[in-house]
Amino acid sequence: MVLYANRESLIKRYTLKVLEQIAWLPEAQSLDEAKVQEALEDASQTIDSYLGGRYVLPLKTVPAVLERHCCYIARYFLEKNRATDQARQDYEDTIRFLEKVASGAISLGLSDDDETVESENGAMMESAGSVWGRNTSKGFI
């Protein structure tokens, strides 16, 4: 199984202090690494349950957006029954996002076989040439 985020991702997003508040192991006076790992695994499995119907798992290329959503889910799982309003809102938004990915309404930018999708509708700009220049200024410049 591929984890879409890791402990460092959670710390970068929320700070070590916040992570310690929700995953502190009093007996050891340290962060409960097993609890954090379990939350990240559960969050990644939750994401996989939505992606599995649309993409071949495990993904060869993991879009950065999944790391963020994995952190949202993991924090919600770590907070359990005392989830903050923000953690609950992030979790609910993430589930809605994943439902849209599963239905095809939102794309991760990957094809069904997990290759990065090359866009055929890119913008191309062309110039008609210089309108004003030394040669056309007739000595004005």
UniProtKB/Swiss-Prot annotation:
Domain of life where this protein originates: Bacteria
One Pfam family linked to the record: Phage_Mu_Gp36
Recorded family membership: To phage Mu protein gp36.
Protein name listed in UniProt: Mu-like prophage FluMu protein gp36
UniProt source species: Haemophilus influenzae (strain ATCC 51907 / DSM 11121 / KW20 / Rd)
